[in-house]
Amino acid sequence: MGKTRRDLLVTGSRVAAGLAAANALAPTGPFGAAQALADPKSKLRRPGFGLAFKSLKDETFLPSIDLDGKLPQWLTGSLLRNGPALFEIGEEKFNHWFDGLAMLHAFSFKGGKVSYRNRFLRSSQYWAWQREGRIKFSELATDPAPDPCRQIFSGVSTLPVLGRIPNANVSIEKLAGEFRAHTEIPIPVRFNPKFLNTMGIGDAGEMQGRLGTAHPHFDPETRERFSYEVELVPPSGLRIVSEKGRTRRELAFIPQAMPGYLHSFGLTRRFVVIVSQPFNFNLSKFLSPDRGPIITNYEWQGEEPTRIILVDRQRGGVAHTVETDSFFAFHHINAYEHEGKVVVDVCAHKDAGVIDALYLKKIRSGSKVPQARYRRFEIRLEGQGKMSQRDLIDAYIELPQKNYGRVNGRHYRYAYGVGLRKGSSGFIDQLVKADVKKGESKLWREWGVYPGEPVFVPRPGGKAEDDGVILSVILDGRRRKSALLVLDARNMEEIARASVPHHIPFGFHGLYAS
């Protein structure tokens, strides 16, 4: 693979080196890469970026896609991805990136070749598109056109009698051999990983909460699955639950008059870690006649603290609560216990403004999206429970991944994510490998290419934490199509890429299934 295919950087103070490397990527055209990246008025600074939020309506199966490079022989499974792919239905438009119709993607590896398949999740919203040609159900930031029959809680109702299949466009979970798509409504949608056909919703026992997490945790040692549910109506609050087989246990219920928005949580050997942030649900506003979509009923109350709550996994109940200045986080990176402290690493935003920045009108216009810092909190378990915090690396990071099976809930060194180059405007333009031991990062960046979540796949038998590959679905704006990028996870150098003949809209999360 020639050096003109990648821009490999090691962060620190090497801005000049980064620009020099970008110059080596100069495309054909009136501007070199470095100039286009640096000049905010340059039309070339984000070529093809509009495709990231352009609908993809076609479902397809490609038994073999173009491959540049050579795949590791041990890579024989499938990368499964989830994300929005349809942003309008007829004349009606979804408002937010989080609202688009869910599409599943599968890149499968066999005999050194790569096949590709995509398929819409057959949600109730999907069938409304097919049968009625309209947006029928509420999403996070989009309500359907006025309908006198619409129930006030239609956007968040999880009652199984409704037969509602949610638009589960966020993440994928493998549990007991079953593959499930998730969103923040706690009804998983089962699907076949080979053909991507929708197989129905999960058990009714999982539907007690109004909202839930798209990122449950599974502990392979205890065989427990952990999640939470948020009750928006009285008695409102946060319920922490664990499941083992068919046994479900409520670890804690934390009353909250105005429940805060949650997307993920952390897990250590002893604790469930909740970051309760002051982006609070206003029930009275939600019940008013002029209420808007569900997310518009949340209010950022930055004068309130963000609370880190530790729930005891074995005994149940809240073991510790500490407070810090307000911040907002979608994603936990990791959490673990070390030398009498609980270490909590998150992608920390200044406030909840990132949600507003991800409305489609704003993001398509090229508005800069607020970026998250790699922030560590250390909570002492003895005495007054004092807490310290610091940012671990200089680079921004979001959509974090790690060697999950090896280090989740345990002491670790490496994490991976997406980010935006310092000083640039826009959304995402690089992949990040964080070394929290050294406080350094390695970056992969290529001009005009926009990467997605990096999924780490460990090499069978590998001893080092970072011995494996990174799989990231990238949008090549210059060629106006997407590809699967394969990097060596140790040095972030490209091994191969497999291209599809069309664009794939920006997605959220996925996993590798062997």
Stretch-by-stretch model annotation:
Residues 68, 158-175, 212-221, 264-266, ...:
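Structural signature of eukaryotic scaffold interfaces centered on beta-propeller domains
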Residues 127-249:
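Well-ordered mid-protein domain cores that form the structural environment of catalytic cofactors
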Residues 193-207, 243-256, 307-325, 377-396, ...:
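Blade-edge beta-strand/turn elements of extracellular beta-propeller
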Residues 238-245, 289-314, 359-381, 429-436, ...:
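Beta-propeller blade signature
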Residues 387-477, 485:
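Substrate-recognition/cap regions that form aromatic- and gly/pro-loop-enriched pockets
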Residues 1-19:
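N-terminal secretory signal peptides and thylakoid transit peptides that target proteins
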Residues 91-92, 279-300, 349-368, 420-423, ...:
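Short, conserved, GDST-rich strand-edge loop motifs in beta-rich repeat architectures
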Residues 23-70:
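C-terminal segment of N-terminal export signals and the immediately downstream linker at the start
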